[in-house]
Each structure stands twice: as structure tokens, then as C-alpha cells.
């Protein structure tokens, strides 16, 4: 779910915190990517086109196709991705997970009704709602990434929290996900739409944590309380409080405790046994692996391993897989060259700089000739001692 209404609130009140760029703008950057979000995108993208890519046994492969070609595109653009996979969800998320299970049951019933009625639009809509990333999808994606030479991290809990920890430790530049709670976990940069298909022509949207705090006139602790008021995965929100009212309350009272002391109970209903304090602590101190102990390495791809893994039962085209492996190798070599070039920085050669250099060379030449002439003349006019 992420944080309800947060992106619009930032766009309305702190637009300076958002910048849109082409993918190539992030050339040379390391980016931590929410793997489950990516796999979900790849699965629903193919479902929306009406059919699942599958093995000879009917097992889906669209998540692998998406991961393979989208990762190649990132590397082609000079971006070094590291994929972060979810671990176990925190206990406080059980309520949200139960709601998702209920919505899934409703979607299954609605899909059956749409199928019986021959409603193509309804079939597509409810098919998308039934997509779920499984442990098997994640396992296969990790195997593929290893063969591609791209690192991944198994988060002990929430992937967004682990991504944020990598950003804060300086291991990567940004978190790439569609869930805004990466900012609530303290990621200083958040990239949305980075892993969208090229056909969608969506510019990458970059959110700056420092600029959004400045624009909203709050600190990081107050921002966490704002996100809880807006609605997060860990607890219910107060009914009747929308995004604009939430930021007004935070700007006035600075924390949830003081807001509750001053809230008009005739207008707003606070959830019974509201676990906002536990939710706050989950954002402040999430369960993550120590980022300093994580060693990120991008290595050469295993072309034969990729062919064996993707072709055969998974029915990928061997020629395309080999071409993809060559692109991976080329990207690896280009990144090595960039690192070498960074040791030998040269200033750009502008017309003014070139002309100035020519003038200096000519002046130096004239000075040398004059000096030579004087020395020669002095030698001829001097008597030997």
C-alpha cells in the first residue's frame, strides 16, 4: 500500500522536492531496487496483454523475461542495480495482509462473474488484482540475477527499509520503488518509474527527502507521524483526516500525541487500541541487515548458464538470450572504463580554452626565440676572459 496520498501532497506543497529526468540522467549511479515491486510489474504487464508467458508445463516466465530485459536496459544506461527482496513481514502488518487476502477473494468472485458475462475489461481488471509474487518467483529471479552478474540482497524484513538503509550508508544513490514508504524509512532519494517499460514513456520521478522536509516545514520525526496519519501498512488511520488536514495538524501540534489531546472527537474517530506508537518505531528502527556488512559486486555474466536456465523448458529464444548476455558483458566493460576514466579527469576543450592555449604557446615560442637571439648576440660581442 505504501503511504496514501503522500506523492500528491508533496507535489502540491513541496514541488521543489520532485524532479523528472530521463533514465540516462542516472548514468554511473548505483540504485537499490524493490525486487518484489518489479516482479509484480512484470507479471501484471503481461497479464494485461491477455496471456501469460509460460514454460512447457504452464509455469509463468513473464517475471524472468521482465527481469532479464529490464535489467539489461538499466545497465545499458550506465545504472548499476542491486535488487532487494522482502523477508518476513512485521507482525504489525498482519492486519493489512488480512485485508489483502479479503480483497483477493472478492477479486476471484468478480473475475468469475466477469468471465461468465464475457466482460473483457472486467476480466483484465480482476486478473491484475489476483497477481501475487510468490517465493518461487523470487527464487527464480535470484538465480537469474546471479547468472547475469547482478547483486541482490535478502532483507530480513521489509525491502523498502533495507533499500533505505543502503542509501543512508552511502552504498547506493537511491531507492527505486513505487511505494512511497521508502521515504518514511529515511531513504534520501526515491525513484519512481525507473523499471517501467520503455514503451510507457514515463520519465523517472525523483523525490528528495531533504527538500520535501523543507517544503512541508517538518522534521523527520514529524514526517513519520504525518505518514501514519495519511495511512500506512502498519496501523489504521483516523477516519475523516485527509492529506491536507493531516499536514495542518502536524504543522500545528508537531506529533500525534498532542494532536490526540486536541482532536475534536465529535468530528473524528480514533481507531480503538491504535498502534501508532509501534508503527512509528517500525519506521524509526526497522529490522534491516547492517548495510556496512553488505558487499555489492557486479561481475561478468555466465552466458552458457543463462542459455541453460532460460532456454529449453522456459522457451526463451537462444539467439536473443546470447545477444542479451553480450550486452551485459559490454555494459560491464563500459563501467570499468568509466571507473578508469574517473582517475584522469580532463577539462572540456572549449573554443576559448583552445585559443588561449594557442596564444600561450605562441608567446612561449616568441620568448624562447628572443632569448636565443640575445644569448647568441651576447656571445659574439663578448671578449674571452
Curated annotation (Swiss-Prot):
Q: Where is this region: I-domain?
A: 122-253
Q: Where is this region: Disordered?
A: 346-385
Q: Which cofactor does it need?
A: Mg(2+)
Task: List the PROSITE patterns.
Answer: XPG_1, XPG_2
Q: Which InterPro entries match?
A: 5-3_exonuclease_C_sf, Flap_endonuc, HhH2, PIN-like_dom_sf, XPG-I_dom, XPG/Rad2, XPG_CS, XPG_DNA_repair_N
Annotated region Interaction with PCNA: the residues are 336-344
Is rRNA-binding set as a keyword in this record? Answer: no
Q: Which Pfam families match?
A: XPG_I, XPG_N
- Which keywords does the record carry? DNA damage, DNA repair, DNA replication, Endonuclease, Exonuclease, Hydrolase, Magnesium, Metal-binding, Mitochondrion, Nuclease, Nucleus, Phosphoprotein
Residue positions binding DNA: 47, 70, 158, 231, 233
Query: Into which EC class is this enzyme placed?
Result: hydrolase
A GO-annotated cellular component: nucleolus
* Annotated binding of Mg(2+) 1, by residue: 34, 86, 158, 160
Major location (coarse) = nucleus
Give GO MF terms, alphabetically: 5'-3' exonuclease activity; 5'-flap endonuclease activity; DNA binding; magnesium ion binding; manganese ion binding; RNA-DNA hybrid ribonuclease activity
Note down the stretches annotated as region N-domain.
Answer: 1-104
Q: Where Mg(2+) 2 is bound, by residue?
A: 179, 181, 233
Instruction: State the compartments where it is located.
Output: Nucleus, Nucleolus; Nucleus, Nucleoplasm; Mitochondrion
Question: What does the PTM comment state?
Answer: Phosphorylated. Phosphorylation upon DNA damage induces relocalization to the nuclear plasma.
Q: Provide the cofactor note recorded for this chain's UniProt entry.
A: Binds 2 magnesium ions per subunit. They probably participate in the reaction catalyzed by the enzyme. May bind an additional third magnesium ion after substrate binding.
According to its UniProt entry, what is the function of this protein? Answer: Structure-specific nuclease with 5'-flap endonuclease and 5'-3' exonuclease activities involved in DNA replication and repair. During DNA replication, cleaves the 5'-overhanging flap structure that is generated by displacement synthesis when DNA polymerase encounters the 5'-end of a downstream Okazaki fragment. It enters the flap from the 5'-end and then tracks to cleave the flap base, leaving a nick for ligation. Also involved in the long patch base excision repair (LP-BER) pathway, by cleaving within the apurinic/apyrimidinic (AP) site-terminated flap.
Family, according to the entry, reads as follows: Belongs to the XPG/RAD2 endonuclease family. FEN1 subfamily.
Q: Which protein is depicted?
A: Flap endonuclease 1
Organism, by scientific name, is Drosophila simulans
Organism lineage: Eukaryota, Metazoa, Ecdysozoa, Arthropoda, Hexapoda
Gene from which the chain derives: Fen1
Amino acid at each position: 500500500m505504501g503511504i496514501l496520498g503522500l506523492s500528491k501532497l508533496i507535489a502540491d506543497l513541496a514541488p521543489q522536492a520532485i524532479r523528472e529526468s530521463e533514465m540516462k540522467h542516472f548514468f554511473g549511479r548505483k540504485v537499490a531496487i524493490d525486487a518484489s515491486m518489479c516482479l509484480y510489474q512484470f507479471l501484471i504487464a503481461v497479464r494485461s496483454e491477455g496471456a501469460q508467458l509460460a514454460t512447457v508445463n504452464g509455469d509463468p516466465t513473464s517475471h524472468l523475461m521482465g527481469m532479464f530485459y529490464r535489467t539489461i536496459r538499466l545497465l545499458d544506461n550506465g545504472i548499476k542495480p542491486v535488487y532487494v527482496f522482502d523477508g518476513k513481514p512485521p507482525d504489525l502488518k498482519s492486519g493489512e495482509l488480512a485485508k489483502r487476502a479479503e480483497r483477493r477473494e472478492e477479486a476471484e468472485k468478480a473475475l468469475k462473474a466477469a468471465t461468465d458475462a464475457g466482460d473483457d475489461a472486467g476480466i483484465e481488471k480482476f486478473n491484475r488484482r489476483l497477481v501475487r509474487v510468490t517465493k518461487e518467483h523470487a527464487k527464480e529471479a535470484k538465480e537469474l540475477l546471479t547468472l547475469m552478474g547482478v547483486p541482490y540482497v535478502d532483507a530480513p524484513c521489509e525491502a523498502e527499509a533495507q533499500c533505505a538503509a543502503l542509501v543512508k550508508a552511502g552504498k547506493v544513490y537511491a531507492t527505486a520503488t513505487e511505494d512511497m514508504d521508502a521515504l518514511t524509512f529515511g531513504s534520501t532519494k526515491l525513484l519512481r518509474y525507473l523499471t517501467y517499460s520503455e514503451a510507457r514513456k514515463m520519465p523517472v520521478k525523483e523525490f528528495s527527502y531533504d527538500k520535501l522536509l523543507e517544503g512541508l516545514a517538518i522534521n523527520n520525526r514529524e514526517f513519520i507521524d504525518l505518514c501514519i496519519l495519511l495511512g500506512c501498512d502498519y496501523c489504521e488511520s483516523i477516519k475523516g483526516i485527509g492529506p491536507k488536514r493531516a499536514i495542518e495538524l502536524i504543522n500545528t501540534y508537531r506529533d500525534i500525541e498532542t494532536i490526540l489531546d486536541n482532536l475534536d472527537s465529535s468530528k473524528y474517530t480514533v481507531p480503538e487500541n491504535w498502534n501508532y506508537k509501534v508503527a512509528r518505531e517500525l519506521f524509526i528502527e526497522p529490522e534491516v541487515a547492517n548495510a556496512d556488512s553488505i558487499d555489492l559486486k557486479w561481475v561478468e555474466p555466465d552466458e552458457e548458464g543463462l542459455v541453460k536456465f532460460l532456454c529449453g523448458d522456459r522457451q526463451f529464444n537462444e539467439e536473443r538470450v546470447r545477444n542479451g548476455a553480450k550486452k551485459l558483458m559490454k555494459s560491464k566493460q563500459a563501467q570499468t572504463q568509466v571507473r578508469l576514466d574517473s582517475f584522469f579527469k580532463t577539462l572540456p576543450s572549449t573554443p576559448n580554452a583552445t585559443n588561449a592555449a594557442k596564444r600561450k604557446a605562441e608567446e612561449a615560442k616568441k620568448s624562447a626565440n628572443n632569448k636565443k637571439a640575445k644569448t647568441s648576440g651576447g656571445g659574439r660581442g663578448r671578449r674571452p676572459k
